[in-house]
């Protein structure tokens, strides 16, 4: 009888602990917008390294390094620089073939892209440290995007950004 009472008490204590943990657990989605005109950091609760933003009218478009991951060059849209949504990927399925590098790659491929809007077209330029400077373009941020084009074959280049001169040349 005493043994059964001890087992019942232990079972009650152990079960109460599990129930307390279950009732306290709340899974929340991160929201930076406080709903009162303020926000809390981080605005983007994810790894969007080397972000670049361009403004077209009242809209903001962001892209960031995607390295060797696919879909690559995700495009995010915002009206207020706080609330962002993914609207497309400029490199959805494949990157250009890689020539064998002289040494191992460490997260290369798409580094520090630059997104710009010029003469009704969106352009994204990025550097691949082993191959050179690539570019994709689209008339709409939602896509479809062109296939990546190797603009300049060169090693060791990252953090590219286009500038258009008065003649319209990049």
What spans do the regions from the language model cover?
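Carbohydrate-active catalytic/glycan-binding domains of CAZyme proteins
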Residues: 20-170
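Bacterial N-terminal signal peptides that target proteins for export
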Residues: 1-6
